[in-house]
Structure formats: structure tokens, C-alpha cells
Amino acid sequence: MTGSQVIDAEEDRHKLVVEYKDTLQPADFYHNFKQRGIRSVQLIPHLEFDELGDLTPASVTAELWGKFLIALFECWVRADISRISIELFDATLQKWCGSENPHPRRDCQACDWHRLCPHAREETPDSMLCAGYQAFYSYTAPHMRVMRDLIKQHRSPMELMTMLR
């Protein structure tokens, strides 16, 4: 893969590290793992700090992380709903369908998206990427609403792919 690596493959879920260079070509990143037959993915943003505590050039930024997630979502939502499992997308849809995010961190309580965000419960370096996650949640909200409503009607969320054509 272009700079990304499978660091663990457990129960067929591949953990892929997303580096700065990957965020510049999200469609290539998506099609690359799809062509390799990978059907279940956990995306891990690469955050590395130098001795001064600053992000290294290989690290993703919040803005690029958001754009990357949105571009990946666009690939997935148009062709691969229920065919490829991307953990963040699956977890987000589960939250839209009613699963709650208990006890968000104090600094996350004012965020409109804390109920969806897996990082709202813990202090992690990923909180540096809040703006990216917020952009992703905002962008995907209309699609998530439609998929949630399809599921409530005992229909497949895959029907959204046809609606988007």
C-alpha cells in the first residue's frame, strides 16, 4: 500500500496506519486495499511527535484527516456498503441507530458530535484530530440518516447506493 501498513490482522480486520502521504490520495488508498481483497478495516491515523512535541511531517493533520475520511466515505457509500467494513463508518452508523456514547470527556460535551465520536470518552492523541472527525460527521450525517431510516424500515442500507446513482 502507498505508505500504509497492515500492523495487525485479527479476525480478518486489518489495522491500517494512515500517514500524511496517504491523506493526499484517499481514492488510491481505498482502491489499493480493496484490490488486495481486504474487506474489514480499522483506520489508524499516524501521529508521531518530535523531541519538541511537534507533529512530524509523516503525521496526519486534522484538516487532512477529515478530508481523507470524507473521500473514503464517498468511495464506500457509492459502491461498497455492507461489502467492505470500515470500523469508523460502522461505528458511526451504529450510533445513529441508537447506540449511545456514555460519559463524554468534559472538553467534548459541548461538541455537537460527541455522541458519535469514539474519542469523546478518553484522553487520546486523536483529540488532536477533532476538527477532522467533526468534518467527517457533519458531511456524512445526511447519508447516515438515510441508512438509519432504511434499517428502521427493515431494509438494507445498501439501498442508499442505488439512491446515489
Predicted regions and their residues:
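Radical SAM enzyme [4Fe-4S]-AdoMet core and its adjacent flexible, acidic
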Residues: 1-99
